[in-house]
Amino acid sequence: MFTTTAYNTLGEVQESETQNDSWAATEMCLDMSMLYGYAETTDLWGRHYGDYGDRPNALGQRVY
């Protein structure tokens, strides 16, 4: 399971979606980043899977 979360430039959550397929999650992440500016995908345990766009400063630096 992969959860993709989209954020606006202020770091506010705009949309979130869960996918079972890793490739579908990657495509969703790219689509959401184009709509909102930044999106990231995490796995079932909250580990970073991928992101697209410019990470808002309000979210802080991502720890991998």
Model-derived segments and spans:
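Short, mixed-charge low-complexity intrinsically disordered segments
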Residues: 34-64
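A short, exposed loop/beta-hairpin motif centered on an aromatic-Gly-Thr core
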Residues: 11-23
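Short aromatic-glycine-(Arg/Gly/Cys) micro-motifs in beta-strand/loop hairpins
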Residues: 1-14, 43
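Short stretches within intrinsically disordered, low-complexity N-terminal or propeptide regions
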Residues: 8, 26-27, 41, 60
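Charged, amphipathic alpha-helical segments
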Residues: 20-28, 62-63
